Swiss-Prot record:
Belongs to the TRAFAC class translation factor GTPase superfamily. Classic translation factor GTPase family. ERF3 subfamily. Residues 114-123 have a biased composition (Low complexity). It comes from Kluyveromyces lactis (strain ATCC 8585 / CBS 2359 / DSM 70799 / NBRC 1267 / NRRL Y-1140 / WM37) (Yeast). Its main location: cytoplasm. This is Eukaryotic peptide chain release factor GTP-binding subunit.
Length: 700
């Protein structure tokens, strides 16, 4: 007996309980379909079934009118082929429901029909031969041609099983080896008819879908029903769709984060890298005047514009301030002679491109200064050598000390200290006055944490006349200084390495509405291209980069870390964004937390710090109210060894490790992973009380 017949024998077990046809099934199981066809009682048995179809019972009553063309010619049971078992599957279900009272058909619907349907799906060898020998009705070939023309308009759905989806079904059918190509004409005809019927049998039942975990193996069960098989196909098709979507997202992320050749980036900007510098210092130290003169000396502002500002300043009674008007464009700033917000300007030299950040010097605007310092690479601390002004700015609680401390906290590790106004009549390029200023500042900068020998340089300049800015100081005026000018030193100093191929990250410094939503900030890591998809944290909003503007307001296709940019974005409204939000890579989003462990150094505190102490935290461009919830350790001076017992409180000069909790989620990282997003400043009542760094992120 052939393997196909053995399989048919197992699938025909349901017919054993089909009492009226028991004798035919016995021959069928022994000899295959050929033996069954040889029984003389077969036509009579099927005629009994035909007679039943003529009775007006249930849904079966409409069977004959609908299928009259294909059904009536079947006078023999053997000639029914696919029609009885597979094509008419839907009517068999109704037939079984209404015929359950017949003893001879009671068990047919439970087992017999499933076996028959599985039998038809196999298409055994020699199955079509008996139909050709039938003496009643049309031939099988004629019927197949007729059925093919009737169902030709019905397309066959194609559902593919996605093996990569990771979804497995309980009781799923074990995969069957692919069938070999059949050459027999009658078998090909049978397959054509079966294709038309398969469209109906593959319609899924959603309620039957059972999905197990990907790690669980398939459960081996008996041969599944047609509904289970079709459900498996449908589920697999859906899984394939979702998998394809995930793959496309991964491909998009991979594409936008492809490595960028640093040589290509240099060629884009003529071989010039970009540096952000911030002018800091006490009010009236001459920061804006020095910045304006730098723009004029480098050709970023033409002579006609400067002459216009000079006339306007003279008319306003501010003749000596005209150079500062290049930076201070606000009317209030010009009238009061002091900077209120961080001014921005751009200039180029033969070697580098620069962005000037002009920070306000008044203590009322320290928050703005912190935001500017967080975007700077190099700090220029402007000190007025004029008698009275130096003492006010440094020795009597001025902003010089606080600005230097905040710059170090915000990651400005390179400091240029320019002793300004050396041409003032009260100074006259006096070396003794210069040395006095340098001596006091050196000790203070060491205490703040600067390596004075490597990271700090001092130089005498005149911001108003331009002496020492672009060209070196005239030896006639200052014979005792032979060092470089400010621009000379900036062009030749070593800058920090840029992580061009790191995950993209841009803390938002400001926002505006300009033909859409526009955000501004410095790219801290990675790079960005027009059309990239990014993630806005902490809202987790997906946004698209529509336009990129560089420092010169020019539209570009790409920007890299270290650059100050403006981005027009799509997917979020301007009012939904706040300073301190971070545009980040979807693949490596920045952490969004409310609790973390930090190392804190208290620099100025009139009272004490204990559990429950509240203050304001400045971290990158974010400002957030925080509470010190727990004091964990006290750090010993010099060794930084942790105390075994937590301290009850902390005071000025102490270093501690504590748990800090924010009122709202804030975008941060540990200092070791991303220093720019892991260091912060604590302020209370307008005073900087502590600096710190995040050592551990706690789960919310």
């Amino acid at each position: 007996m052939s393997d196909q017949q053995n399989q048919d024998q197992g699938q025909g077990q349901g017919y054993n309980q089909y009492n009226q046809y028991g004798q035919y099934n016995q021959y069928y199981n022994q000899q295959g379909y050929q033996g069954y066809n040889g029984q003389q009682g077969a036509p009579q048995g099927y005629q009994a079934y035909q007679a039943y179809g003529q009775q007006p019972q249930g849904a079966y009553q409409g069977y004959n009118p609908q299928q009259a063309q294909g059904y009536q010619p079947y006078q023999g049971y053997n000639a029914q082929q696919q029609g009885y078992n597979a094509q008419q599957g839907g009517h068999n279900n109704n037939y079984n429901k209404n015929y359950n009272n017949k003893n001879s058909y009671n068990n047919y619907n439970k087992q017999g029909y499933q076996g028959a349907q599985g039998y038809n799906a196999q298409q055994p060898t020699g199955y079509a031969a008996p139909a050709q020998s039938s003496s009643q009705g049309m031939t099988l070939k004629d019927f197949q041609n007729q059925q093919g023309s009737t169902n030709a308009a019905k397309p066959k759905p194609k559902l593919k099983l996605a093996s990569s989806s990771g979804i497995k079904l309980v009781g799923a059918k074990k995969p069957v080896a692919p069938k070999t190509e059949k050459t027999d004409e009658s078998k090909e005809a049978t397959k054509t008819t079966d294709d038309n019927e398969e469209a109906q049998s593959e319609l899924p039942k959603i309620d039957d879908l059972k999905i197990s975990e990907a790690e669980k193996p398939k459960t081996k069960e008996n041969t599944p029903s047609a509904d289970d098989t079709s459900s498996e196909k449908t589920t697999s098709a859906k899984a394939d769709t979702s998998t394809g979507g995930a793959n496309s997202v991964d491909a998009l992320i991979k594409e936008q984060e492809d490595e960028v050749d640093e040589e290509v980036v240099k060629d884009m900007f003529g071989g010039k890298d970009h540096v952000s510098i911030i002018f800091m210092g006490h009010v009236d130290a001459g920061k804006s005047t020095m910045g304006g003169n730098l723009l004029y000396l480098t050709g970023s502002v033409d002579k006609r514009t400067v002459e216009k500002y000079e006339r306007e300043a003279k008319e306003a009674g501010r003749q000596g301030w005209y150079l500062s008007w290049v930076m201070d464009t606000n009317k209030e700033e010009r009238n009061d002679g002091k900077t209120i917000e961080v001014g921005r300007a751009y200039f180029e030299t033969e070697k580098r491109r620069y962005t000037i950040l002009d920070a306000p010097g008044h203590k009322m605007y320290v928050s703005e200064m912190i935001g500017g310092a967080s975007q700077a690479d190099i700090g220029i601390l402007v000190i007025s050598a004029r008698k009275g002004e130096y003492e006010t700015g440094f020795e009597k609680g001025g902003q010089t000390r606080e600005h230097a401390l905040l710059a170090k906290t915000q990651g400005v590790n390179k400091m240029i200290v320019v002793i300004n106004k050396m041409d003032d009549p009260t100074v006259g390029w006096d070396k003794e006055r210069y040395d006095h200023c340098v001596g006091n500042l050196t000790n203070f900068l060491k205490a703040v944490g600067y390596n004075v020998k490597e990271d700090v340089i001092f130089m005498p300049v005149s911001g108003y006349t331009g002496a020492g800015l672009k060209e070196r100081v005239d030896p006639k005026d200052c014979p005792w200084y032979t060092g470089p000018s400010l621009l000379e030193y900036l062009d030749n100093m070593k800058t920090t390495d840029r992580h061009i191929n790191a995950p993209f990250m841009l803390p938002i410094a400001s926002k505006m509405k300009d033909m859409g939503t526009v955000v501004e900030g410095k790219i801290e890591s990675g790079h960005i291209r027009k059309g990239n998809q990014t993630l806005l944290m902490p809202n987790r909003t997906s946004v698209e980069i529509l336009t990129i503007y560089n420092e010169t307001e020019s539209e570009v296709d790409m920007a890299v870390c270290g650059e100050q940019v403006r981005l027009r974005i799509k997917g979020v409204e301007e009012e939904e964004i706040s300073a301190g939000f971070v545009l980040t890579s979807p693949k490596n989003p920045v952490k969004n937390v409310t609790r973390f462990v930090a190392q804190i150094a208290i620099v100025e505190l009139k009272s004490i710090m204990s559990a429950g102490f509240s203050c304001v935290m400045h971290i990158h461009t974010a400002i957030e109210e925080v509470t010190v919830t727990r004091l964990l350790h006290k750090l010993e001076k010099g060794s930084n060894r942790k105390s075994k017992k937590p301290p009850a409180f902390a005071k000025k000069g102490m270093k501690i490790i504590a748990v800090i909790e924010t009122n709202e989620p804030v975008c941060v990282e540990t200092y070791d992973d991303y220093p720019q997003l892991g260091r912060f400043t604590l302020r209370d009542q307008g005073t900087t009380i502590a600096i710190g760094k995040i050592v551990k992120i706690l789960e919310n």
